[in-house]
């Protein structure tokens, strides 16, 4: 697929895809569809549903939009009582939990093939986000990612001509970007890292800030959990990766100590910092401010692979009561296939999603757009999924990052304490799955 792939070609692909599988031809059914797209993305979703209903006379989808948290609270009881919706969107941080509790039904290879859903059309790690114990439970409809925003004007002023892609390049560029309020640079006599006028990179102390540490750990060959799904983010690979990030503050003085996301966001908007790693959801904000900025994939801080954090939403089929209408399940799979075709995914990117598949990332509508700077590596985005106790792992991990970044604890001590706390919580959580 070339970079000149157009929407017309995508529509042609959709038409071919529709002919490649046996479309639903059963009796007319009505599907209930529960999702949490309640913001600016809601009108886009409603438009897609209207298009589906208009082109599928024997399938009518009735959608209900409500806050994600409400769905997480209600879904177990709905499944247990046999009143589950036909299709539910579940996010990456919740899906493994619902799968492990038996609230979501697996999608067999035969079902996916019959519905025309080809796993290969999606980015591999994104599709596998909804896999568990070798089975698939969902199809991705939406994706977001942790990226690096960079200020082109400040980089030019500081003589930086290349967006860093490696650890060494990041450190060199960050040092070049950093100046204290007296005009001194890192390494010069009298340099004051506690009073910076401009600085190289934004680090901060909340869960979003910790996702850079997560990326660095994966890049270095580490992981949040081990094969037994116990916390393991204090491995030597993890300690080394996080130590580099903390050293950007404590050793090199190219990032502000103990800062917040809000403070760093404001500083980037004001042209004070060269590199602002965060969620791609700030794209519209920076474009609205008419900033001269770019978007790049997270530099490879580790030595093993490219990796960045990603969030995603997946179309799933909840477990239904005995005697559930098989026609409804076939129709629901038809709906899932249609919603995740290239043409629909291209439309969905209007709501702020990243492309979920290379065919859409190659569309010419993205040419010249800042966000296209990450498209070559969308296959290296990894969600924090695959273990049922995400909260029990991520809460202590986020706290460990905050303690290490702020200097309250050494990196190793912070990660060790985080793993200890996470595993205590996991031990308790395991009892609820027995």
Provide a role label for each language-model segment.
Residues 47-122, 131, 153-165, 267, ...:
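Extracytoplasmic "Venus flytrap"/periplasmic binding protein-like
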Residues 27-38, 59-64, 87, 137:
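Short, well-ordered beta-strand elements
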Residues 133-141, 146, 171-230:
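Extracytoplasmic/periplasmic solute-binding protein
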Residues 54-55, 60, 156-158, 243, ...:
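Extracytoplasmic/periplasmic substrate-recognition and gating elements
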Residues 173-175, 227-258:
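Glycine-centered hinge/linker elements that transmit conformational signals in sensory
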Residues 92-147, 188-197, 212-215, 292-297, ...:
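Hinge/lid segment of periplasmic solute-binding proteins
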Residues 105-122, 191-195, 199-205, 222-241, ...:
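Short, solvent-exposed loop/beta-turn-alpha elements that line the ligand-binding surface or hinge
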Residues 121, 125, 296, 349-403, ...:
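Long, aromatic- and glycine/proline-rich binding clefts that accommodate carbohydrate-like moieties
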